[in-house]
Amino acid sequence: MIESDRIITASPFSSQEEVIERALRPVQLDDYVGQEKIREQLKIFIEAARLRQEALDHVLLFGPPGLGKTTLAHIIAREMGVNLRQTSGPVLERAGDLAALLTNLETNDVLFIDEIHRLSPVVEEILYPAMEDYQLDIMIGEGAAARSVKIDLPSFTLVGATTRAGMLTNPLRDRFGIVSRLEFYTADELGKIVTRSAGLLNVDVTADGAREIACRSRGTPRIANRLLRRVRDFAEVRANGRIDRPVADAALQMLDVDATGLDVLDRKLLLAVLEKFGGGPVGVDNLAAAINEERDTIEEVLEPYLIQQGFLQRTPRGRMATTMAYQHFDIIPSHQTTVPSLFDPD
């Protein structure tokens, strides 16, 4: 299975879906559900910056995909009353690409760089003085005739987003004044998000119907909204258009998303650990080969949720299935297997 084909992937499927997602995004912090600590911190920091008529400190947002990093970047710009310029690390191939963006910023604007961990070293070097001193330091000419030129920039806020905070260099990470980790959402929070999105989409959903979708959304708003749209389709064709718990359950079973939010690929990974490797430990490269997936897909897409839910444990010797994984598949461990619980030390 290709990761982008999964109904429960946190990555956008298409430009059309991105348009729908934008329509469902909250536009101010008061409408933002979840991430309470981050939301309260940003309220204070934004209000203080506005009172001083200064740019907000540079902000680094990190965590698994689909949790609202892009949404928060848009909200920050809106709450500050400034423009948002958006790009991504892979797009900024040359120093000139970043220089063009920086020189077109207006005072206190927000520059949002998604996947900031994928910036090239040469682009990152340009970013250091821009973040620290609001200056652009570029080289003009080549060889003996080359000279450094400093260009003053307006004050601005860089908002960086990444799913791989550990891949950021220390000099870049240290230049962010506000660093926030986004966590998976609770079922209650996702239920509120599903209910809000259903209202915007004119979908009739009951509280228990919204809860059923929320419980299978892997703690991720983007997945919750995607499942809501697919359950809506099912309800319109197979039911009376109203989403209650039985309708949501039937639709999600059809989509092969089980009660814990696991799909075919999740189950394939866990069963490989359980059956092919005796519950582990198994190295990630061997595991990737066993299920015919990329290492990055396992580390960035599958593992975070499986570990967070207690199905998988990452140890110095490799990945191990937990007691919960054995119970989920009704598999009895062999007597040789030492099964870790969620609270065993790594």
Curated annotation (Swiss-Prot):
Homohexamer. Forms an RuvA(8)-RuvB(12)-Holliday junction (HJ) complex. HJ DNA is sandwiched between 2 RuvA tetramers; dsDNA enters through RuvA and exits via RuvB. An RuvB hexamer assembles on each DNA strand where it exits the tetramer. Each RuvB hexamer is contacted by two RuvA subunits (via domain III) on 2 adjacent RuvB subunits; this complex drives branch migration. In the full resolvosome a probable DNA-RuvA(4)-RuvB(12)-RuvC(2) complex forms which resolves the HJ. The RuvA-RuvB-RuvC complex processes Holliday junction (HJ) DNA during genetic recombination and DNA repair, while the RuvA-RuvB complex plays an important role in the rescue of blocked DNA replication forks via replication fork reversal (RFR). RuvA specifically binds to HJ cruciform DNA, conferring on it an open structure. The RuvB hexamer acts as an ATP-dependent pump, pulling dsDNA into and through the RuvAB complex. RuvB forms 2 homohexamers on either side of HJ DNA bound by 1 or 2 RuvA tetramers; 4 subunits per hexamer contact DNA at a time. One of its GO terms (biological process) is DNA recombination. Keywords: ATP-binding, Cytoplasm, DNA damage, DNA recombination, DNA repair, DNA-binding, Hydrolase, Nucleotide-binding. This is Holliday junction branch migration complex subunit RuvB. Its main location: cytoplasm. The keyword Nucleotide-binding applies.
